[in-house]
Amino acid sequence: MKFIVKLFPEIMMKSKPVRMRFTKMLETNIRNVLKKVDETAKVKREWDKIMVLVPDDRQDLVEAFAERLACIPGIAHVLQVSESTFESVDDIYQQTLAVYKDELAGKTFCVRVKRVGNHDFRSIEVERYVGGGLNQFTEAAGVRLKNPDMTINLEIDKESLYLVSKRIEGLGGYPMATQEDVLSLISGGFDSGVSSYQFIKRGSRTHYCFFNLGGDQHEIGVKQVAYHLWQKYGESHKVKFISIPFDPVVTEILEKIDNGQMGVILKRMMMRAAAKVARKMGIQALVTGEAMGQVSSQTLTNLSIIDRCTDQLILRPLIAMDKQDIINLSRKIGTEDLSKSIPEYCGVISQRPTVKAVLSKIEAEELKFSEDLIDRVIEAAEVIDIREIATSMDTKITSTETVGDINSGEVIIDVRAPEEEEQSPLEVEGVEVKAIPFFRLATKFADLDKSKTYLLYCDRGVMSKLQALYLQEQGYDNVKVYRP
């Protein structure tokens, strides 16, 4: 069994050297991701596609490979195929009949053929021959070229025949690291998660800069969002997570700044700090989740004034998107439930925000700040490899017990994503196991029996630890981490 990975159309339009570079990078990215599933994963690059081979004795890898290929930037779609050779058009028909005869019963169908190489027949001739044979010698309801119940896809590549059993839509976009790095200002809300995803999809290694205004509980929630985005869509490359303690800045704003100017000035201070961090990391652009008119600081006048605080390029991929469209996309990429549980801190500091700030007034207010304020908070920033999030939390989860044995009455909560849980469900004899995905646990945990102790489980022990800390900060002491 094989997967045929089809390149995103914009890659196909590039010049030969650029297309080759992008395809090589995509091959490397696929290999990096799949080798985390199975070390023996075989990936082969061709001019117009990439082949992923699944050994006949490892069919257990099919679903895992398919799931990960669907989330790698640069892929238009993936075809799950079985490969064989053929001698004639009739041989192609006979092989197709053997595979699809039973499945066609009572259904309308059409046959679609794509062909590469020199043959003594055309693609349409194969479609007619195979379609006519299937219509005559199966119990199909007939041929229907538009909107059939079933489409039989065949790919012919020189002497090879590929019978397509499944088509999996890809993420699109460009392969990771074919574009320059960006630093995304992430708050954990709907907007910043979606804007980060947009640049991952577009091929940029997306690092995360978080301004902590709400303590450890806020930080752990944001780390969950960032880790989820990286693990699902950008796992092929290392990125950094930077946490900047911004409460000293907020304190000075509340004590010294005119109330109406607070929102714009807070954003300008964030941009200044992020720009300094980006320059240290050799990153040219910042990414934010701002959308025009969504809040008072996001009018065109205010955005223009915010931009003037730095010469760093500031990118806003959501600038013209409606809020509901942003929420819908966050649901699609798996961050909606995580973002729902994270409060928005920026909006609470100004009661009468200006929607049309004046630059001279803003600059006059900013003279009230301590001169070294930004440098001090950057100096106190925590910079970690996003893969080390679990390790970094070990020092904070001092009261969370990690257990390998289960006591009577304890309940296991499997916090893995639904597709992972379905692929390899956790079963422990004599123990109740509840499947609650990590992104729903924050809202579902309050409904559980408070008299019981819950053991959180995931494959790597990362999300279970993050969720344990999060729940403990909310006041729950009946939670542990389960590592069998």
UniProtKB/Swiss-Prot annotation:
The keyword Transmembrane helix does not apply. SMART domains: THUMP (SM00981). Keywords: ATP-binding, Cytoplasm, Disulfide bond, Nucleotide-binding, Redox-active center, RNA-binding, Thiamine biosynthesis, Transferase, tRNA-binding. One of its GO terms (biological process) is tRNA 4-thiouridine biosynthesis. Residues 63-167 form the THUMP domain. Its EC number is 2.8.1.4. Pfam families: Rhodanese (PF00581), ThiI (PF02568), ThiI_fer (PF22025), THUMP (PF02926). It catalyses: [ThiI sulfur-carrier protein]-S-sulfanyl-L-cysteine + a uridine in tRNA + 2 reduced [2Fe-2S]-[ferredoxin] + ATP + H(+) = [ThiI sulfur-carrier protein]-L-cysteine + a 4-thiouridine in tRNA + 2 oxidized [2Fe-2S]-[ferredoxin] + AMP + diphosphate; [ThiS sulfur-carrier protein]-C-terminal Gly-Gly-AMP + S-sulfanyl-L-cysteinyl-[cysteine desulfurase] + AH2 = [ThiS sulfur-carrier protein]-C-terminal-Gly-aminoethanethioate + L-cysteinyl-[cysteine desulfurase] + A + AMP + 2 H(+). Its main location: cytoplasm. Disulfide bonds join C346-C458. ATP binds at L185, I186, K267, G289, Q298. Pathway: Cofactor biosynthesis; thiamine diphosphate biosynthesis. One of its GO terms (molecular function) is tRNA binding. Residues 406-484 form the Rhodanese domain. One of its GO terms (cellular component) is cytosol. It is an enzyme of class 2 (transferase). It is found in: Cytoplasm. PROSITE patterns: RHODANESE_3, THUMP. The active site is at C458 (cysteine persulfide intermediate). Belongs to the ThiI family. NCBIfam families: ThiI_C_thiazole (TIGR04271), tRNA uracil 4-sulfurtransferase ThiI (TIGR00342). Catalyzes the ATP-dependent transfer of a sulfur to tRNA to produce 4-thiouridine in position 8 of tRNAs, which functions as a near-UV photosensor. Also catalyzes the transfer of sulfur to the sulfur carrier protein ThiS, forming ThiS-thiocarboxylate. This is a step in the synthesis of thiazole, in the thiamine biosynthesis pathway. The sulfur is donated as persulfide by IscS. This is tRNA sulfurtransferase. The gene is thiI.
